[in-house]
Amino acid sequence: MRLALHELNAAREHLISNRLGETFKMISRVARIFEQLNNAWDVLRTMTPSDYSSFRDALGASSGFQSHQYRLIEFLVGNRNCAMLKVHEHRPDLLAMLKAELEQPSLYHVALRVVEQELKLSLPGDAFRMAEPHQCNKSIEDAWVQIYQQPTEYWMLYELAEKLVDLEDYFRRWRFNHVLSLIHI
């Protein structure tokens, strides 16, 4: 998770600086990290509930969805739900770190700014609310449709979209595998 966070932060900084090539490299690397994490579930799924119970206490609150690193990744990429901060209230240092992330634009916020600039659009301000979950927005959807309908004209934006979709796919599968494994054990 630490490497994923490092790479996602770097991707965001490169995207802010409009260095798309570097951004693509970082996002691709994070997608590969989650691909490897997904592959690990093939081994972890062989564990029985008693196998898992033998070491679960050693993980403390640092495992899975309670992990502050997991939550940082969620917030950094753009899945921002402030209700999830409550899990970390017992650790003021981690809570402060998570709140600080919510004050930064997410990777998706920055991607929307790039889309807005490149397409010469004016996306609605509510698309850029830092600490709130994204809402469906016709203007944003229309911008992505325009990019996907004309990929050769907007190749770099199309490539950005594809990198984000790839990352989301691996991350979503990791979350799904995590939940299924926990149900099993």
What are these regions (language model features)?
Residues L3-L37:
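Short secondary-structure subsegments characteristic of cysteine-rich extracellular domains
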Residues H6, Q36-S50, N79-K86, L107-Y108, ...:
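Intrinsically disordered or highly flexible coil/loop and linker segments, enriched in small
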Residues H90-H178:
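Internal, well-folded beta-alpha domain core
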